[in-house]
UniProtKB/Swiss-Prot annotation:
Involved in the catabolism of quinolinic acid (QA). It is an enzyme of class 2 (transferase). Substrate binds at residues 91, 124-126, 148, 158, 188, 209, 235-237, 256-258. GO terms for biological process: NAD biosynthetic process; quinolinate catabolic process. Pathway: Cofactor biosynthesis; NAD(+) biosynthesis; nicotinate D-ribonucleotide from quinolinate: step 1/1. CDD domains: QPRTase. Hexamer formed by 3 homodimers. The gene is nadC. Its EC number is 2.4.2.19. This is Probable nicotinate-nucleotide pyrophosphorylase [carboxylating]. It catalyses: nicotinate beta-D-ribonucleotide + CO2 + diphosphate = quinolinate + 5-phospho-alpha-D-ribose 1-diphosphate + 2 H(+). GO terms for cellular component: cytoplasm. GO terms for molecular function: nicotinate-nucleotide diphosphorylase (carboxylating) activity. InterPro entries: Aldolase_TIM, NadC, NadC/ModD, Nicotinate_pribotase-like_C, Quinolinate_PRibosylTase_N_sf, Quinolinate_PRibosylTrfase_C, Quinolinate_PRibosylTrfase_N.
Length: 273
């Protein structure tokens, strides 16, 4: 969904058939408002906020950019427009900035805890319906990378797919003939044996799902000795406390769904001048 369409839907959701306050406002006038932080965080949502303000004819003085940090009481934006319009967009604007900055802030904490420039931190497809592009954009602003955007990006075979695959090597040979040349094949594995089988069958990426650090290290050592061209990804309930240990296990990437689904809104408010 294009940003403009997304924002039009978001505004429509809040406005319905129109803001009732507009019916009782005797005369509209120009006003100024400030968007301020009430807690620290990493700013995200710039692209969406500026498009929203432009769509609604509101001028903006921006004091912060995506990926920059802010502190409590920092003025993030100064906006000016019709008083009625400022009130109409207030909640939509704040929801966008609070949600996006919440994801970016939690992601930045995971990046810091990872503490390894060689291992990539990835998000997942565990996103809210219709918010995937918005939420994955927020992850990028927190310093991580995106995993698949959708099912058409790469072929990932999970336990639900593999349940009815009898010969993995033959299946991957068949898949290669029917996939685009650039498409990667990733296989989710839950044991050392499954990982070895996936490598020998021809997987490009092997995901170590819900494995301990010790099991992941063992698979990484085997990969290094026999299939050094295969990429390894760790995933499954990896926390701020455990991510550094997984980073040291020998994997190339770590995917964490919590970057998005465990992020909470960063507290912000809008006040009139």
């Amino acid at each position: 969904m294009e940003i403009k369409t997304f924002l039009e839907c978001a505004l429509k959701e809040d406005l319905g058939h129109g803001d009732l306050f507009e019916r009782v406002l005797e005369k509209d006038f120009k006003a100024t408002a400030f968007v301020r932080a009430k807690q620290e965080g990493v700013f995200s949502g710039e692209k969406y906020a500026l498009e929203l303000l432009q769509m609604t004819g509101i001028e903006c003085v921006q004091n912060i950019k995506d990926k920059e940090r802010f502190k409590p009481k920092d003025t993030l934006m100064e906006i000016r427009g019709d008083f009625s319009m400022l009130l109409k967009i207030e909640r939509t604007l704040l929801n966008l900035l609070q949600h996006s900055s919440g994801i970016a802030t939690l992601t930045s904490r995971f990046v810091e805890a990872l503490n390894s420039p060689k291992v990539r931190l990835l998000d997942t497809r565990k996103t809210r319906p219709l918010l995937r592009i918005f939420e994955k954009y927020s992850v990028l602003n927190g310093g991580a990378s995106n995993h698949r955007l959708g099912l058409d990006d790469a072929l990932m075979l999970k336990d639900t797919h593999l349940k009815h695959v009898k010969d993995l090597k033959s299946f991957l040979t068949h898949a290669r003939k029917n996939l685009p040349f650039t498409a990667k094949i990733e296989i989710e594995c839950e044991s050392f044996e499954e990982a070895k089988n996936a490598m020998s069958a021809g997987a490009d990426i092997v995901m170590c799902d819900n494995m301990s650090v010790g099991e992941t290290k063992e698979i990484a050592a085997y990969r290094e000795a026999h299939y050094p061209f295969v990429l390894l990804e760790a995933s499954g309930n990896i926390s701020l406390e455990s991510i550094n240990a997984y980073a040291k296990s020998g994997v190339d990437a770590i995917s964490v769904g919590a970057l998005i689904h465990q992020a909470t809104f960063i507290d912000m408010h809008m006040k009139m001048a």
